[in-house]
Amino acid sequence: MTIKNKMLLGALLLVTSAAWAAPATAGSTNTSGISKYELSSFIADFKHFKPGDTVPEMYRTDEYNIKQWQLRNLPAPDAGTHWTYMGGAYVLISDTDGKIIKAYDGEIFYHR
């Protein structure tokens, strides 16, 4: 490897690592631009789901209740709702009957 190639590789690594090292603001969720992750439907457990559908009982248990929604870049759940995870999607459901309110692609986790 020539010195020119080594310098080019070093510069490339420096630029890409600096982009990934940008700190997120502590205690806040960056909700700008998250609409691109919103899903009109998704598949979980070999079944097609959309807002208005009722999720299976298993996803209403405390084990599936996402309490640290900020770490996943999700908006705060409204009163009477909570986030759960189904088949690669984050799903906002009502506490009382498990109706799907909203769903986001799991890639929202990496949103900056």
UniProtKB/Swiss-Prot annotation:
Q: What happens when the gene is disrupted?
A: Mutants show reduced intracellular nickel or cobalt levels.
Give GO MF terms, alphabetically: copper ion binding
Gene Ontology CC? cytosol; outer membrane-bounded periplasmic space
Keyword set includes S-adenosyl-L-methionine: no
| A biological-process GO annotation | DNA damage response
For this protein, the record's Gene3D superfamilies field holds: inner membrane protein cigr
Give the principal location in a single coarse category. Answer: periplasm
State if Signal is listed as a keyword. yes
Keywords, ordered alphabetically: Periplasm, Signal
Induction of the gene = Repressed by RcnR. Induced by nickel and cobalt.
Q: Which domain of life is it from?
A: Bacteria
Q: Where in the cell is it found?
A: Periplasm
Query: Which segment of the chain is annotated as a signal peptide?
Result: 1-25
InterPro entries, per database record: RcnB
Role this protein plays: Influences nickel and cobalt homeostasis. May act by modulating RcnA-mediated export of these ions to avoid excess efflux. Not involved in nickel import and does not bind nickel or cobalt ions directly.
What family is reported? Belongs to the RcnB family.
- What protein name is recorded for this chain? Nickel/cobalt homeostasis protein RcnB
